Amino acid sequence: MLKNVVNRVSGRKRLAKLLGLSLKQEGDRQFLLDMLPKGSVGAEIGVHLGDFSQEIIDIISPGELHLIDPWEHLTSSIYKTAWYGGGAKGGQVEMEERYASIRERFYQCLHANQVKVHRGYSTDILRQFPDQYFDWVYIDGNHLYEYVRKGLELSFQKMSNWMGT
């Protein structure tokens, strides 16, 4: 998870060096899937259409996977290129369709209680879980610094110690 966060930060090579991390090519998430334990309890913040969620299910076969996303169209100019802003030409209607597609795509996993879909902001949703509930949290939601920072702080509180947190 830390490598993924570092990959998204300006000056990531320097930050990775300070943290003692070696980075793979940007966009390569396979290394994350390889290091996450099978049967673990995890959360994905920022689900979009569920493509990475599907990879998590297929490769990790988590005991529980919590998919967290507000599926909300944001109209502020700072989101003009984001898939949840200007990139969603259909506005909130498109977001409702994306949410419905997630529920349909993971229908069997939902009914097997392997996947749980939470619609809302990650900070609000994560607060509903006890501390150290998750084995891992994958953060790929709102990419603005303040939101990433809040997500990281709360995620570390909600994760167990398997990754040394």
Regions found by a protein language model. Name each.
Residues 1-39:
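Class I SAM-dependent methyltransferase Rossmann-like catalytic core
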Residues 29-165:
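S-adenosylmethionine/decaboxylated-SAM
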